[in-house]
Curated annotation (Swiss-Prot):
Any single GO CC term annotated in Swiss-Prot or TrEMBL for this entry: cytosol
Family, per entry: Belongs to the UPF0301 (AlgH) family.
Stored PANTHER family: UNCHARACTERIZED PROTEIN YQGE, UPF0301 PROTEIN YQGE
Organism listed in the record: Nocardia farcinica (strain IFM 10152)
InterPro entries cross-referenced by the UniProt entry: AlgH-like
Recorded coiled-coil stretches: none
Source organism, top-level taxon: Bacteria
Positions of the UniProt region annotated as Disordered: 1-24
The protein's name in its UniProt record: UPF0301 protein NFA_55110
Pfam family, one: DUF179
Amino acid sequence: MARADDPDERKTQGGHGDRRRREFRGGEQVVRAGTLLLAATDLTEPTFRRSVVYIMEHNDSGSLGVVINRPSETSLADVLPRWSALAADPGTLYFGGPVKRDAALCLGTLKVGASTAGVPGLRRIDGRVVLVDLAADPERIAPLVEGIRVFAGYAGWTFGQLEGELDNEDWIVLSALPTDPISAARPDLWADVLRRQPLPMSLLATHPIEVERN
Protein backbone atom coordinates (compact mmCIF):
# COMPACT_ATOMS: atom_id res chain seq x y z
CA MET A 1 0.00 0.00 0.00
CA ALA A 2 1.05 3.63 -0.16
CA ARG A 3 4.38 3.93 1.53
CA ALA A 4 5.15 6.04 4.57
CA ASP A 5 8.92 6.05 4.16
CA ASP A 6 10.23 9.03 2.24
CA PRO A 7 13.98 8.92 1.52
CA ASP A 8 13.99 11.71 -1.06
CA GLU A 9 11.09 13.59 0.60
CA ARG A 10 9.29 13.62 -2.76
CA LYS A 11 9.59 17.37 -3.21
CA THR A 12 6.59 17.59 -5.47
CA GLN A 13 6.24 21.37 -5.20
CA GLY A 14 9.70 21.84 -6.68
CA GLY A 15 11.64 20.40 -9.60
CA HIS A 16 11.64 16.75 -10.56
CA GLY A 17 14.63 16.53 -12.84
CA ASP A 18 14.42 14.67 -16.12
CA ARG A 19 12.75 11.48 -14.97
CA ARG A 20 11.72 9.06 -17.68
CA ARG A 21 7.97 8.76 -17.87
CA ARG A 22 6.71 5.24 -17.94
CA GLU A 23 3.44 3.38 -18.12
CA PHE A 24 2.32 0.11 -16.61
CA ARG A 25 -0.20 -2.05 -18.37
CA GLY A 26 -2.08 -4.78 -16.57
CA GLY A 27 -4.71 -6.13 -18.91
CA GLU A 28 -6.40 -2.95 -20.12
CA GLN A 29 -5.12 -0.88 -17.19
CA VAL A 30 -2.73 1.98 -17.88
CA VAL A 31 -1.27 4.09 -15.08
CA ARG A 32 0.22 7.46 -15.92
CA ALA A 33 0.11 10.99 -14.57
CA GLY A 34 -3.48 12.16 -14.84
CA THR A 35 -5.25 8.85 -14.28
CA LEU A 36 -7.44 7.83 -11.36
CA LEU A 37 -7.04 4.88 -9.04
CA LEU A 38 -10.31 3.74 -7.48
CA ALA A 39 -10.15 1.41 -4.52
CA ALA A 40 -11.52 -2.02 -5.42
CA THR A 41 -14.67 -3.08 -3.60
CA ASP A 42 -12.76 -5.51 -1.39
CA LEU A 43 -10.06 -3.00 -0.40
CA THR A 44 -11.18 -2.35 3.17
CA GLU A 45 -8.14 -0.62 4.69
CA PRO A 46 -9.67 2.54 6.26
CA THR A 47 -7.14 4.92 4.68
CA PHE A 48 -8.05 3.86 1.15
CA ARG A 49 -11.51 2.34 1.40
CA ARG A 50 -13.67 3.75 -1.44
CA SER A 51 -10.92 6.24 -2.15
CA VAL A 52 -10.29 8.03 -5.43
CA VAL A 53 -6.60 8.77 -6.02
CA TYR A 54 -5.41 11.22 -8.67
CA ILE A 55 -2.00 10.13 -9.97
CA MET A 56 0.39 13.06 -10.22
CA GLU A 57 3.58 11.19 -11.04
CA HIS A 58 4.39 7.70 -12.33
CA ASN A 59 7.93 6.87 -13.41
CA ASP A 60 10.99 4.78 -12.62
CA SER A 61 11.22 6.31 -9.14
CA GLY A 62 7.72 5.15 -8.20
CA SER A 63 4.25 6.65 -8.12
CA LEU A 64 2.69 9.57 -6.29
CA GLY A 65 -0.91 10.72 -6.02
CA VAL A 66 -3.44 12.36 -3.76
CA VAL A 67 -6.76 11.09 -2.46
CA ILE A 68 -9.32 13.54 -3.83
CA ASN A 69 -12.42 12.49 -1.88
CA ARG A 70 -11.38 12.96 1.75
CA PRO A 71 -12.39 16.50 2.83
CA SER A 72 -11.45 17.65 6.31
CA GLU A 73 -13.37 20.07 8.50
CA THR A 74 -10.51 22.59 8.40
CA SER A 75 -11.23 25.67 6.33
CA LEU A 76 -8.46 26.58 3.92
CA ALA A 77 -8.89 30.17 5.07
CA ASP A 78 -7.61 29.09 8.50
CA VAL A 79 -4.37 27.54 7.23
CA LEU A 80 -3.62 29.19 3.86
CA PRO A 81 -5.66 32.41 3.77
CA ARG A 82 -3.85 33.75 0.67
CA TRP A 83 -5.26 30.88 -1.37
CA SER A 84 -8.72 30.56 0.11
CA ALA A 85 -10.41 32.73 -2.53
CA LEU A 86 -9.30 30.27 -5.24
CA ALA A 87 -10.41 27.15 -3.39
CA ALA A 88 -13.17 25.11 -4.98
CA ASP A 89 -16.19 24.25 -2.85
CA PRO A 90 -16.35 23.33 -0.03
CA GLY A 91 -13.23 25.43 0.56
CA THR A 92 -11.64 23.02 3.03
CA LEU A 93 -8.31 21.27 3.33
CA TYR A 94 -8.38 17.69 2.04
CA PHE A 95 -6.55 14.64 3.38
CA GLY A 96 -4.32 13.64 0.45
CA GLY A 97 -2.85 10.47 1.91
CA PRO A 98 -0.82 8.93 4.73
CA VAL A 99 2.62 10.25 3.70
CA LYS A 100 3.88 13.59 5.09
CA ARG A 101 0.58 14.89 6.37
CA ASP A 102 2.37 18.02 7.56
CA ALA A 103 3.10 18.95 3.93
CA ALA A 104 0.66 20.53 1.49
CA LEU A 105 0.21 19.83 -2.21
CA CYS A 106 -2.06 21.89 -4.42
CA LEU A 107 -3.81 20.91 -7.64
CA GLY A 108 -5.69 23.28 -9.90
CA THR A 109 -7.84 23.03 -13.00
CA LEU A 110 -7.07 25.55 -15.72
CA LYS A 111 -9.83 27.42 -17.48
CA VAL A 112 -10.42 26.24 -21.03
CA GLY A 113 -7.86 27.91 -23.29
CA ALA A 114 -5.70 29.22 -20.44
CA SER A 115 -1.94 29.08 -20.98
CA THR A 116 0.71 28.56 -18.32
CA ALA A 117 3.45 30.10 -20.46
CA GLY A 118 5.42 32.67 -18.53
CA VAL A 119 3.46 32.07 -15.32
CA PRO A 120 5.71 30.87 -12.48
CA GLY A 121 4.27 28.42 -10.02
CA LEU A 122 2.28 26.21 -12.39
CA ARG A 123 3.36 22.82 -13.73
CA ARG A 124 1.06 20.93 -16.04
CA ILE A 125 0.33 17.35 -14.97
CA ASP A 126 -2.14 16.30 -17.64
CA GLY A 127 -4.49 18.31 -19.84
CA ARG A 128 -5.92 21.17 -17.80
CA VAL A 129 -4.75 19.84 -14.43
CA VAL A 130 -1.74 21.62 -12.94
CA LEU A 131 0.41 21.40 -9.84
CA VAL A 132 0.36 24.76 -8.08
CA ASP A 133 3.36 26.01 -6.11
CA LEU A 134 1.94 27.46 -2.90
CA ALA A 135 4.92 29.82 -2.71
CA ALA A 136 3.72 31.52 -5.91
CA ASP A 137 1.57 34.65 -6.14
CA PRO A 138 -2.12 33.63 -6.08
CA GLU A 139 -3.12 36.87 -7.81
CA ARG A 140 -1.18 35.83 -10.92
CA ILE A 141 -2.73 32.39 -10.93
CA ALA A 142 -6.33 33.35 -10.11
CA PRO A 143 -7.29 34.46 -13.67
CA LEU A 144 -6.12 31.13 -15.11
CA VAL A 145 -7.84 28.54 -12.93
CA GLU A 146 -11.39 27.36 -12.36
CA GLY A 147 -10.36 26.46 -8.83
CA ILE A 148 -7.74 24.80 -6.68
CA ARG A 149 -7.66 22.07 -4.06
CA VAL A 150 -5.05 21.80 -1.29
CA PHE A 151 -4.18 18.39 0.13
CA ALA A 152 -2.42 17.52 3.38
CA GLY A 153 -0.17 14.54 2.66
CA TYR A 154 -0.11 12.19 -0.29
CA ALA A 155 -0.06 8.54 -1.30
CA GLY A 156 3.23 7.13 -2.55
CA TRP A 157 4.46 3.83 -3.95
CA THR A 158 8.02 2.65 -4.47
CA PHE A 159 9.08 1.29 -7.84
CA GLY A 160 7.08 -1.85 -8.59
CA GLN A 161 4.85 -1.56 -5.52
CA LEU A 162 1.81 -0.18 -7.30
CA GLU A 163 2.21 -2.76 -10.05
CA GLY A 164 1.99 -5.47 -7.40
CA GLU A 165 -1.20 -3.96 -6.00
CA LEU A 166 -2.69 -3.81 -9.48
CA ASP A 167 -1.80 -7.46 -10.03
CA ASN A 168 -3.62 -8.13 -6.76
CA GLU A 169 -6.63 -6.21 -8.15
CA ASP A 170 -6.59 -3.71 -5.26
CA TRP A 171 -7.23 -0.80 -7.64
CA ILE A 172 -9.28 0.08 -10.69
CA VAL A 173 -7.51 2.38 -13.16
CA LEU A 174 -9.76 4.89 -14.92
CA SER A 175 -9.45 8.09 -16.91
CA ALA A 176 -9.89 11.37 -15.05
CA LEU A 177 -11.91 14.41 -16.01
CA PRO A 178 -10.08 17.76 -15.77
CA THR A 179 -12.46 18.82 -13.01
CA ASP A 180 -12.10 15.70 -10.86
CA PRO A 181 -9.39 17.14 -8.58
CA ILE A 182 -11.61 20.12 -7.69
CA SER A 183 -15.02 18.49 -7.83
CA ALA A 184 -17.35 19.51 -5.02
CA ALA A 185 -17.62 17.20 -2.04
CA ARG A 186 -20.44 14.95 -3.16
CA PRO A 187 -21.77 12.14 -0.97
CA ASP A 188 -19.80 9.47 -2.84
CA LEU A 189 -17.32 10.53 -5.53
CA TRP A 190 -16.13 6.91 -5.78
CA ALA A 191 -19.58 5.82 -6.99
CA ASP A 192 -19.98 8.91 -9.18
CA VAL A 193 -16.80 8.08 -11.11
CA LEU A 194 -17.96 4.51 -11.62
CA ARG A 195 -21.42 5.58 -12.84
CA ARG A 196 -19.90 7.43 -15.77
CA GLN A 197 -18.13 4.26 -16.98
CA PRO A 198 -19.64 1.90 -19.57
CA LEU A 199 -21.26 -1.36 -18.56
CA PRO A 200 -20.43 -3.59 -16.79
CA MET A 201 -17.98 -1.34 -14.89
CA SER A 202 -20.72 1.14 -13.96
CA LEU A 203 -22.55 -1.59 -12.03
CA LEU A 204 -19.85 -1.42 -9.35
CA ALA A 205 -21.30 1.94 -8.32
CA THR A 206 -24.17 0.06 -6.70
CA HIS A 207 -21.81 -1.67 -4.27
CA PRO A 208 -23.08 -0.71 -0.80
CA ILE A 209 -20.98 1.50 1.44
CA GLU A 210 -21.60 -0.79 4.41
CA VAL A 211 -21.78 -4.36 3.10
CA GLU A 212 -22.35 -5.80 6.56
CA ARG A 213 -25.65 -3.94 6.82
CA ASN A 214 -27.17 -5.77 3.86
